[in-house]
UniProtKB/Swiss-Prot annotation:
GO terms for cellular component: cytoplasm. The lineage of its organism: Bacteria, Bacillati, Bacillota, Clostridia, Eubacteriales. Belongs to the TRAFAC class translation factor GTPase superfamily. Classic translation factor GTPase family. EF-G/EF-2 subfamily. SMART domains: EFG_C, EFG_IV. Gene3D superfamilies: 3.30.230.10, 3.30.70.240, Elongation Factor G (Translational Gtpase), domain 3 (3.30.70.870), P-loop containing nucleotide triphosphate hydrolases (3.40.50.300), Translation factors (2.40.30.10). Catalyzes the GTP-dependent ribosomal translocation step during translation elongation. During this step, the ribosome changes from the pre-translocational (PRE) to the post-translocational (POST) state as the newly formed A-site-bound peptidyl-tRNA and P-site-bound deacylated tRNA move to the P and E sites, respectively. Catalyzes the coordinated movement of the two tRNA molecules, the mRNA and conformational changes in the ribosome. It comes from Pelotomaculum thermopropionicum (strain DSM 13744 / JCM 10971 / SI). This is Elongation factor G. Residues 8-282 form the tr-type G domain. Pfam families: EF-G_D2 (PF22042), EFG_C (PF00679), EFG_III (PF14492), EFG_IV (PF03764), GTP_EFTU (PF00009).
Amino acid sequence: MARQFPLEKTRNIGIMAHIDAGKTTTTERILFYTGRVHKIGEVHEGTATMDWMAQEQERGITITSAATSCRWRDCQINIIDTPGHVDFTVEVERSLRVLDGAVAVFCSVGGVEPQSETVWRQADKYGVPRIAYINKMDRVGADFHRGIQMIRERLGANPVAIQLPIGVEDGFCGVVDLVRNRAIIYTDDLGTTSEETEIPPELAGEAAAFRERLIEAVAEFDESLMEKYLENGELTEEEIKEGLRRATLAVKIVPVLCGSSFKNKGVQPLLDAIVDYLPAPTDIPAIRGVNPVSGAGEVREARDDEPFSALAFKIMTDPYVGKLTFFRVYSGRLKSGSYVYNSTRNRRERVGRILRMHANHREDIEEVCAGDIVAAVGLKTTTTGDTLCDEKEPVILESMEFPEPVIQVAIEPKTKADQEKMGVALQKLAEEDPTFRVSTDPETGQTLISGMGELHLEIIVDRMMREFKVEANVGRPQVAYKETVRKKARAEGKFIRQTGGRGQYGHVVLEVEPREPGSGYLFTSKIIGGVIPKEYIPAVDAGAKEAMENGVLAGFPVIDVGVTLLDGSYHEVDSSEMAFKIAGSIGFKDAARRADPVLLEPVMKVEVVVNEEYMGDVIGDLNSRRGRIEEMEARNGMQVIHAYVPLAEMFGYATDLRSRTQGRGNYTMQFSHYAQVPDNIAEGIIARRVGR
């Protein structure tokens, strides 16, 4: 099948922002103006195309990343609308990994909010070029210039206005296009008709000053343009566009636009900017990976004639077609019905059907090419972060890292009939979401589910009921504590059994040591001279990993440790993988007990917005919750307190804050890091856990 759009006419973009900045509303308008939908859906009415889950329509928030495609000015734009709520950060992380560019939406009143910072840092991590869109210019308190200042100060970016608003709040009626030096005035409510005029006289001075800044910013990153500018004092429209595109692709500049998506103003110029300034798959560096056989580095150019390579970035269960695997094609082609090699798991799989998604509607396609973002049916073992490639030319692309869950609840089925269904439902939901974990409490045998926050787990339980018809009782939220060690220690692990016939023999000497926070688990073998045959070494690793699931202090999972296998011995007849696995587990537990084990708890980054008169009371309360105040700032006549507070102290905080501030305070929090629990508190937690 011939390619419908040349690769340079393709844009893979994400729309990202803080909750309620207007991402989904902006996407709805994009779909309307590109002719993808013929009636505008509204988030507050529960009819938004991209928010297709029942929970999204009820709550007016985006939970999953919905994918869709549309066309504008001969370009195919693949859009992923991502959630803004902090509990669903994983959705943003995996979307940014496979996108080429992004539109960051900001609220003109709130400016840069906490989750805006989080998604911006995630985009920085993957080097994603982006443009900023300051939305809600029609709201009371809208301030375009403060928005730009906050992008500069709080995100450390280099924002450059390429538009100015005409009017503000109720009077917002259009934008000044600084590149073309013209004004665009919207003349109807739907925003489909607009007229282009001279810049209004009252804005002429400001527009000239901002246009000069724009030209200087563009010329700064391009010597030939700088020379031309110094000679003529001016650049043509085409030169400004080319310079802006180059600087945006190099992540040196963030072009800033404005509008009001809800009032249908400013969306078509945003579409133009997506086409003009965001990258095509051919503009980004070739993807790098590793050959799983030789370990050598591999490069895949974004071309159809290269060997096939793709990254699976999301799994979804569809009630009609079963398991859907979303993937981004980096190079080559793949036909529907053909076989593909999962190099991460060393498995060959058959692609039953390939679908192009429009939110939750699907369109079958016969073949995908480089640069496409599509979903496949029929991949049974593939999970998030796996590489799919050509079996003759294998490659493993860099995967994604996901944060550890911070909160857990016990869950039990209401009836015997729900028991079996619950296991299947939880397994499917865990496949879809890498930050959602299912485990069993070793003491009580209860099923525990862990996630990124109360809303995250609430949605999971809700989905179990709606999609899998499982009724469950849910316990009170608990903190997902972890354990780690503070010093090096070594120990022996011996497992010897002599019962008539063949016995069991495994003997290892292990050293356990602390690693940097967030660096995870690392196993190293220093066995030389075959004192332990190499086929038994992975079993020692597996035994240590298994022992880490229940730590030595209070049975919490152990994180950030290194295990080194130093020595051991084996028996010609009696040794087996099982014996070495058990020996590894015994050795790890013994070494961990000697390595000064400590309890860790999740610490949240909290931002509280209150009136000045309540400041003292709120700060005193945060201190009593073991909080550490970082800084305070004034914003829009309110006081903003930034603090780090342990999650254990934040349950019920919303109600508490409301009563302290007479309902006028609000807060946001997101996971920051794990930190050691103070000894006096750790003793109580361990006693409750062990003594029940």
